[in-house]
Regions:
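Thiolate-centered catalytic microenvironments shared by cysteine-dependent enzyme domains
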Residues: 18-26, 82-182, 198-199, 214
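Positively charged, proline/Ser/Thr-rich regional signature most characteristic
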Residues: 20-100, 176-248
């Protein structure tokens, strides 16, 4: 019947999830499995999978999801930088994303690279963005539906953004140096080995290495996974507050 709540345990879990989301500064950004399943056939929603392991998508993905490879699609292939304005517009066009499309990202490793994709979309001021809480691994653990069928999409219009929002949301060398000298909070989300200087890059990412080992003076180590539960969902607002209070 229209308007009836989901059955039994699913309804209880969804209420708990909604309460968790409501405590965040931007609860509208997070969605759960029930939300995804309600919007699988929504033409105004594009689900995007972006993983550390770029081969995972082909082994099965959420029905209708497209694949964005963080190395090939989001990074400049010549210089160490993000794609430029026209590259972003072309990425959206070929993946069936318009200016008004709601883009929902998810991926492996507690949404590590999915959130990277989310950030790149923010860099170009795409308005409607969401993250599937728990990402790919949580979806699979919940027996969420998977398919190997790759959606066939016709290109759609997407205007070239007037500029990349570098000044608004990126910190460059001079910004970070001034921040550190002022003893303001700095969080290093890399691996403990990279933070200590034991390694200059994670084995999987030689192209992401640094010239010198160690960390910026005054920075606190708080690896990405610290913000996630064992089931890959994000920790609660209260848990996150404690983590960053200790580290800052």
């Amino acid at each position: 019947m229209t308007g009836c709540p989901p059955p039994g345990g699913l309804w209880v879990r969804r209420l708990a999830m909604n309460e968790k989301f409501a405590a965040y500064a931007h609860p509208e950004v997070l969605v759960d499995r029930a939300w995804i399943e309600e919007h699988l056939d929504d033409p105004n929603v594009r689900i995007v999978e972006s993983n550390e392991d770029i081969l995972l998508y082909d082994t099965g993905h959420i029905p209708g999801a497209v694949h964005i490879d963080w190395r090939r699609d989001l990074q400049d292939q010549t210089v160490r930088d993000y794609i430029r304005e026209e590259g972003f517009a072309e990425l959206c066009r070929r993946n069936g994303i318009t200016e008004s499309t709601t883009v929902v990202v998810y991926g492996d490793k507690s949404n590590w690279w999915a959130c990277y994709a989310f950030w790149v979309f923010t860099l170009f001021a795409h308005k409607n963005l969401k993250v599937l809480d728990g990402g790919r691994d949580h979806w699979v653990a919940q027996d969420g539906p998977l398919t190997k069928e790759v959606p066939s999409l016709e290109p759609v219009p997407y205007p070239t953004p007037p500029k990349r929002r570098d000044a608004e949301i990126r910190a460059f060398f001079v910004d970070t140096l001034a921040h550190a000298k002022a003893a303001l909070p700095l969080v290093d989300v890399r691996s403990p080995g990279e933070f200590s200087g034991e390694v200059t890059h994670m084995p999987e990412y030689p192209q992401e290495g640094v010239l010198r080992g160690g960390h910026i003076p005054g920075a606190h180590s708080c690896p990405w996974k610290t913000a996630a539960n064992d089931d890959d969902t994000f920790k609660s607002k209260e848990e996150l507050a404690k983590i960053y209070e200790v580290n800052l």
